[in-house]
Amino acid sequence: MSTTTAGILFALSLALALAAVHVPLGDYMYRVYASEKHWRAERVAYRIIGADPAAEQGWGSYARSVLAFSAVSILFLFGLQLLQGRLPLHLNDPATEMTPALAWNTAVSFVTNTNWQAYSGESTQGHLVQMAGLSVQNFVSAAVGMAVAMAFVRGLARRDTGELGNFWVDLIRGSLRILLPLSIIGAIILVSGGVIQNFALHDTVVSTLSGAQQTIPGGPVASQEAIKELGTNGGGFFNANSAHPFENPTTWTNWVEIFLLSCIAFSLPRTFGRMVGSRKQGAAILAVMAVIATLSLSLMMLFQSQTHGTVPTAVGSATEGVEQRFGVADSAVFADLTTLTSTGAVDSFHDSYTSLGGLMTLFNMQLGEVAPGGVGSGLYSMLVLAVITVFVAGLMVGRTPEYLGKKITPREIKLAATYFLVTPLIVLIGTAVAMALPGQRDGMLNTGPHGLSEVLYAFTSAGNNNGSAFAGLSVNTEWYNTALGLAMVFGRFLPIILVLALAGSFARQGRTPESVGTLPTHRPQFVGMVTGVTLILVALTFLPVLALGPLAEGLH
């Protein structure tokens, strides 16, 4: 069996597994967020934080709760990192100094669900920071995205009200009822597959084949690895991330990790369909995600199987930066889905991909990570694109556009259009400023088109809250730590504010009855329109800079 055939079978098995859990997991998440009962542990949490679970919030109050919780989380994680040398389970001789700029960048990164890492995890962060800081944020940052998605869906489903639910209820339920039990199951599976789970620091010394002594770092890896993937976080315990054999030792664990990073995002459309009272609407959104993901994965595997240069031609594929235990095809599947979602974990190194393979990782993020996107963020991003599509279709036939019985007035389309413009502006302005400053260009280890691609990738990853990187860019500097931190903050919270404002606007409307001129939003025609609008908008926005970077490199 050829490696390409094996890779196709690998991808098909993942698709079948995701299809199998789509309905039960989507229905379970619907029951979690629709339930009127509170667990005892949840009631304790409400009392601790002083929240009234029976109180509904409008979009402004919901947004303020999101921002307040995230701000406190950033401050806590920032302080924990700077003080870790005085706390238990710290590293005695960290390889990288934890400066305020790096602590800021890391705190923002994990709170925004980006998990961009400008440091080597196993030689910089102690176990207490990994467990009480980074792992906790892996849970709650994912739960925040899911909460915002549920608030937006309620805005579409409800009428004549300004209430979108309760952020604190959504946050705690998402963490305790969905992410925690699934991550426990995932961690047990990963441990059984060989992922380590211990409290060893840097005190395990072994003899190498040549007789030298080597220190092997350990830690509670499996427990962090499960939520790292499940919550589409992506920050690795080790610098090599999921390419490290302690995080991802076999093809089986590789398959499990890809499944974990995809399952919630691909199941949320089912939850959406149940909440709006039409499973067909959820199926249509899922179909858009599946079409884009299939196109992207096909191109990624094609480009990574291309052979340019003496060594790739002799080997038969582009193997640089690829772990041989996974192979090119399986690594391409991981790379594609980690950038289609907001995960950013890697089992191979994207900077070593072919120019067009690297282009696909960039383009996937520039889509807004909507196919399926991050947990929660992918769903609300796709629904905003659906709103834009309905508006465009309404212009074509000369009717007031409607989506799920809600009219799209000038206020709604302004919010949706602004939502779409935020991230491209962050990415393009950040890249332009970095390229214009001579001091920042010194951090580029490559010149020419690939050097531009590395800077573009950094700001694309930060602005879209992905976290993966083209590693040929030295980013642990005060400027990059600050600039990329700001890109992560604005790229996370400006879209959240806009999507909650849009949800509040929809919730205040009544329901408009369907008429002969209403565009059906559950048919293949609509699926094709949303797919087309998504691809065209992204192509028009980013094609010029992609032409200067990976496309120019590919032509060269």
Swiss-Prot record:
Establish whether keyword Plastid is in the entry. Answer: no
According to its record, what are the GO cellular component terms?
plasma membrane
Look up the domain of life of the source: Bacteria
For this UniProt record, give its keywords in alphabetical order, as a comma-separated list: Cell membrane, Ion transport, Membrane, Potassium, Potassium transport, Transmembrane, Transmembrane helix, Transport
Q: Where is the signal peptide?
A: none
Q: How does this protein lie in the membrane?
A: Multi-pass membrane protein
Transmembrane intervals: 6-26, 65-85, 133-153, 176-196, 249-269, 283-303, 378-398, 419-439, 483-503, 526-546
Q: Name one GO molecular function term.
A: P-type potassium transmembrane transporter activity
Subcellular localization, as worded in the UniProt entry:
Cell membrane
**Cysteines paired by S-S bonds:** none
User: Pfam families given for it?
Assistant: KdpA (PF03814)
Q: Which family does it belong to?
A: Belongs to the KdpA family.
Cited PANTHER family: POTASSIUM-TRANSPORTING ATPASE A CHAIN, POTASSIUM-TRANSPORTING ATPASE POTASSIUM-BINDING SUBUNIT
Purpose: Part of the high-affinity ATP-driven potassium transport (or Kdp) system, which catalyzes the hydrolysis of ATP coupled with the electrogenic transport of potassium into the cytoplasm. This subunit binds the extracellular potassium ions and delivers the ions to the membrane domain of KdpB through an intramembrane tunnel.
| Self-association and partners | The system is composed of three essential subunits: KdpA, KdpB and KdpC.
What is the protein name for this chain?
A: Potassium-transporting ATPase potassium-binding subunit
Q: Which organism is it from?
A: Mycobacterium sp. (strain KMS)
